[in-house]
């Protein structure tokens, strides 16, 4: 965790908040830590099963940023990520459907809250 003075950037790197296979990971910005500016989550897909995972963010506020680094090992199976939540809109950089994480790939998903219920999502593959 890196913390600055008042008005400065505060970043918290979280490794304890994990993706759950074929389920929704809900990031409650109140319960999962006080992320004043940024939160970074490190997640890994391992094993050979098919996983379709959702990420939801609750109790957000405008101009807060959430970064997800998602890696995948070399085992077989389909691994996908999407964002969804009741009453929340996630404007994704991919056009439709889910983001497939290919074998041995790492992706960074950057999420900016434009309000408590609206988010911009950008996905970038790390090469």
Where are these regions (language model features)?
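Extracellular disulfide-bonded cysteine-rich modules/repeats
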Residues: 1-2, 103-113
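Exposed extracellular interaction/assembly regions and N-terminal maturation sites
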Residues: 2-86, 113-127
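Terminal beta-strand-rich extracellular "head" domains
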Residues: 85-103
């Amino acid at each position: 965790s890196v913390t600055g003075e008042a008005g400065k950037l505060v970043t918290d790197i979280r490794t304890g908040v994990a993706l759950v296979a074929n389920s929704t990971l809900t990031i409650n910005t109140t319960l999962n830590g006080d992320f004043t500016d940024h939160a970074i989550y490190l997640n890994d897909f391992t094993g050979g099963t098919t996983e379709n995972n959702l990420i939801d963010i609750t109790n957000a506020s405008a101009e807060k940023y959430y970064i997800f680094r998602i890696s995948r090992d070399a085992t077989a199976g389909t691994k996908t990520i999407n964002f969804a939540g009741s009453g929340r809109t996630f404007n994704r950089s991919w056009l439709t459907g889910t983001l497939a994480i290919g074998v041995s790939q790492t992706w960074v998903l950057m999420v900016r809250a434009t309000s408590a219920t609206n988010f911009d999502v950008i996905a970038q593959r790390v090469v």
